[in-house]
A protein has these predicted regions:
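Surface-exposed, low-hydrophobicity beta-strand/loop segments enriched in small/polar/acidic residues
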Residues: 1-119
Length: 119
């Protein structure tokens, strides 16, 4: 059985079409879609909130994630500018590890570990 750690935040933009995308802290208790490729992030959005509604964010454990490129099982994952996942490159933040692989535009299983920046 996989355990997840969730945070309850407030969506600071309409996120109805952003479920399973990668998000980050925007302001006090608020989140927005991640906009800086390879930068540090908070976690993966687990629901579909409108602006001002409760947003559930998975910050640790196994979750679904939306791929912005082909993902290979076992690869470390970072974020694209559009909040999707891609394989990490040197100097980028490693959100976690892909447990399954998939094609771009599909969902895969991501183990969120917050591994820091890749050297």
């Amino acid at each position: 059985m996989s355990q997840k750690t969730y945070l309850s935040m407030i969506a600071r933009e309409n996120m109805e079409n952003m479920q399973y995308k990668i998000v980050n802290v925007h302001d006090a208790n608020g989140i927005k879609l991640r906009v800086a490729a390879g930068a540090g992030v908070l976690g993966v959005l687990d629901n579909k909130p409108k602006s001002g509604e409760n947003a559930t964010v998975v910050v640790a454990g196994l979750t679904r994630c939306f791929a912005g490129a082909t993902i290979t099982a076992g690869s470390f994952i970072t974020v694209t500018a559009s909040g999707t996942a891609t394989a990490v490159a040197s100097g980028q933040y490693m959100l976690g590890k892909a447990i399954t692989g998939c094609a771009s535009g599909s969902h895969f299983q991501l183990l969120i570990q917050h591994n820091g920046y890749r050297g």
